[in-house]
Amino acid sequence: MIQKNWQELTKPNKLEVISGDDPKRFATIVAGPLELGFGLTLGNSLRRILLSSLQGAAITSVHIDGVLHEFSSIPGVREDVTDIVLNIKDIAIKMPGDGPKRLVLKKQGPGKVTAGDIQTSGDISILNPGLVICTLDEGAEIRMEFTVHTGKGYVAADRNRAEDAPIGLIPIDSLYSPVKKVSYRVENTREGQNLDLDKLTLQVETNGALTPEDAVAFAARILQDQLNVFVNFEEPRRVEATPSIPELAFNPALLKKVDELELSVRSANCLKNDNIVYIGDLIQKSEGEMLRTPNFGRKSLNEIKEVLAQMGLHLGMEVNGWPPDNIDDLAKRFEEHY
């Protein structure tokens, strides 16, 4: 009786990802069908989490040689320091780890100084290298040192100002979120004879530090984690007699589900949308068939081939007796063999 509260609700049967011109930055993500009202509930929750709660990297302060405060001007530099600081705020950075990290920029004029002129180490990337920071006249030069931290949301410059900060260290407003824009819409859809269902469409733009698909996945995981505390019961478990284990004509590892392979979000969703549930379904696909799957590219193919190779399997295999009858029941019974 208790389980009917959630088991009998309509759940999305697939997640469709429609990539934009730059798949690393733009995507439309469609989920459905949903119970009436759940499109608005999930869409609003995911949007708020996407914009406020995902971790990212940002510059928190800058030191410019010869500059004591942000209301100064620099000889040979056309922009005031205030304008330079505003431009620095827009630099998008991808950085693993927590920081802080130091980055240096040195440039001689004439010409434009861009974010791509920042000297980075191997684990830090500037995602918008064409962003103009300032313009130097003939004979002018500039040296800047940036401090980069990781965090979430928006942090005002005043909160980035350390009490023991040296003179000339200018704090900067930090926008950590890798998500730039999120919008959603809810439309009516149907499943069979049920006409009163929702379809949720999310449009997500990131700065390139995360793909939109991964950003939505992380937001959903955050929401799931926050809701766990409200579940104050354990579901009753049915105790059944252990059935005899039949002999199989194939490796029982093929009964393992592909969502247990720890693939990337994109690869896992491509397999799900192509109705590939078990490893036995996957290995019978050829490379050509996989590459014809929507949104499935060479990178995903190589990832799957590597995972299968670790299990002694490969694409294009023939499996006698596949799929077996009662495959879901068999998968549970052979779980101990994986």
From Swiss-Prot:
Top class in the EC scheme: transferase
Catalytic activity annotation: RNA(n) + a ribonucleoside 5'-triphosphate = RNA(n+1) + diphosphate
One GO CC term on file: DNA-directed RNA polymerase complex
Gene3D superfamilies: 5' to 3' exonuclease, C-terminal subdomain, DNA-directed RNA polymerase, insert domain, RNA polymerase, RBP11-like subunit
Cysteine disulfide partners in this protein: none
Alpha C-terminal domain (alpha-CTD) as annotated region, ranges: 250-338
Signal peptide coordinates: none
Coiled coil: none
One GO molecular-function entry: protein dimerization activity
Region listing for Alpha N-terminal domain (alpha-NTD), in residue ranges: 1-234
SMART domains reported in the protein's UniProt record: RPOLD
Keywords: DNA-directed RNA polymerase, Nucleotidyltransferase, Transcription, Transferase
Enzyme Commission number(s) of this protein: 2.7.7.6
GO terms (BP aspect): DNA-templated transcription
CDD domains: RNAP_alpha_NTD
A Pfam family hit: RNA_pol_L
Function: DNA-dependent RNA polymerase catalyzes the transcription of DNA into RNA using the four ribonucleoside triphosphates as substrates.
Domain statement: The N-terminal domain is essential for RNAP assembly and basal transcription, whereas the C-terminal domain is involved in interaction with transcriptional regulators and with upstream promoter elements.
Family that this chain belongs to: Belongs to the RNA polymerase alpha chain family.
Protein name per the record: DNA-directed RNA polymerase subunit alpha
